[in-house]
């Protein structure tokens, strides 16, 4: 499909659906993979092949979801914990196949803002406890050179703080100039070693996304996750921008709460739910754990 160099199987054919069932069985059962990421091919053209005897050329388009359903159900039957992702590569998700993935993908975000807002989008569409992959953290900052895309992102906070599933595409050892932007240098390794344990220990991706802040209206940009009797807040401003003021910690039940900066391991005092305002300052982002005292 890309540059007319690829062909697509017609998903409306029973033979094609059977083929994908067998491929999935081979990958999950025989090769012991733990899931699938369907990348780039998230739709197909209309099919005008008379040998297929379609009632409509759109039969092929409608049947895409049937194939994804087969892949998801076959994977889960073989491995209940398997992950099925569908990546629409920078385009909007298709409502037809959304039910047939168990981990949505933010799909090639260009910068941190798109990571955060697409996570919120998917939480709205799929439910507040749905799993949403924040895509490779390297995509949180991108530079476009004349001949290639250079992925420079290190913004783990935009995925962790919004309740997304963390990911990275670092390379090691050094494979040369083609992958120099994603090579795990000693400097980057220190950052990765800070954030991955934070994600693994807190697992905010399994919490409940609370729709308490409105993008474009509330400033700074805010998110809230409820998990294990605690509230986790994340606030963001533009890159390298400093912010100072009073944060509104919404959604707290009656009582007094301890406020803790869990990234920098810093106590920030306490707030009362009757007036949950926190006077503070930060640069770029601030991630908080708020627990009842």
What is each stretch, according to the model?
Residues 269-293:
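C-terminal beta-strand-rich structural cap/linker in extracellular carbohydrate-active enzymes
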Residues 1-15, 42-71:
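Aromatic- and acidic-residue-enriched carbohydrate-binding clefts of CAZyme catalytic domains
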Residues 68-266, 279, 284:
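Active-site-proximal substrate-binding groove within the catalytic cores of carbohydrate-active enzymes
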Residues 60, 245-249, 273-274:
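Composition- and surface-driven signal marking solvent-exposed, interaction-prone regions
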Residues 19-53:
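Active-site groove signature of glycoside hydrolases
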Residues 21-28, 65-76:
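Short, well-ordered alpha-helical packing segments
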Residues 1-6, 34-46, 85-90, 131-132:
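Core alpha/beta catalytic barrel or barrel-like domain that forms the active/cofactor pocket
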Residues 1-30, 107:
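Active-site-adjacent "subsite" loops/lids of carbohydrate-active enzymes
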């Amino acid at each position: 499909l890309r540059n007319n160099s690829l062909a697509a199987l017609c998903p409306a054919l029973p033979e094609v659906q059977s083929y994908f069932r067998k491929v999935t069985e081979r990958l999950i059962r025989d090769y012991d993979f733990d899931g699938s990421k369907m990348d780039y091919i998230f739709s197909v053209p209309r099919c005008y092949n008379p040998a297929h005897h379609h009632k409509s050329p759109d039969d092929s388009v409608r049947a895409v979801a049937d194939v994804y359903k087969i892949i998801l159900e076959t994977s889960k039957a073989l491995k209940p914990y398997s992950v099925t992702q569908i990546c629409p590569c920078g385009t909007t998700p298709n409502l037809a196949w959304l039910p047939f993935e168990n981990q949505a993908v933010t799909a090639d975000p260009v910068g941190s803002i798109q990571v955060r807002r697409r996570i919120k989008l998917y939480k709205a569409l799929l439910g507040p406890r749905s799993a949403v992959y924040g895509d490779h953290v390297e995509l949180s900052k991108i530079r476009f050179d004349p001949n290639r895309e250079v992925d420079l992102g290190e913004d783990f906070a935009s995925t962790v703080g919004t309740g997304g599933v963390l990911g990275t595409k670092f390379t090691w050892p050094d494979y040369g100039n083609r992958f120099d932007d994603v090579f795990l240098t000693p400097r980057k390794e220190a950052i990765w070693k800070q954030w991955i344990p934070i994600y693994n220990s807190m697992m905010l991706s399994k919490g409940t996304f609370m729709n308490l802040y409105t993008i474009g209206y509330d400033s700074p940009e805010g998110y809230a996750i409820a998990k294990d009797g605690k509230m986790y807040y994340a606030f963001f401003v533009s890159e390298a921008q400093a912010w100072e003021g009073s944060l509104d910690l919404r959604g707290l039940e009656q009582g007094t709460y301890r406020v803790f900066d869990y990234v920098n391991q810093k106590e920030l005092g306490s707030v009362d739910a009757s007036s949950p305002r926190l006077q503070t300052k930060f640069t770029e982002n601030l991630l908080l754990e708020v627990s009842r005292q």
